[in-house]
């Protein structure tokens, strides 16, 4: 990829101008996002039913999903300590605000939101490092 300029998103500088898409359920998780970020791109974790591997997913889906946001981010960060890692969070999710707050608490570099208008997103990330 010689000659391609780095990608700049706010204060973030991405060595390779590649943003991995958020593919849920169970595709864009910590392992893939970490691998992409390790190679210099932006690794994206999808929060769509992210907690499907949690033991209480069937009985407490909301809590399982919120908890898995942190654990999947940690998995990605272990693979790419200095990489750019974010989340894809659909506005249409019932617990959108909670997903965003969990991603911010985990230390996400950025959040990509679609499936609706992310009107509340700037207020939810205000005062954090998350773009």
Question: Can you name each region flagged by the protein language model?
Answer:
Residues 1-131:
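Active-site entrance/lid segments in N-terminal catalytic domains of soluble metabolic enzymes
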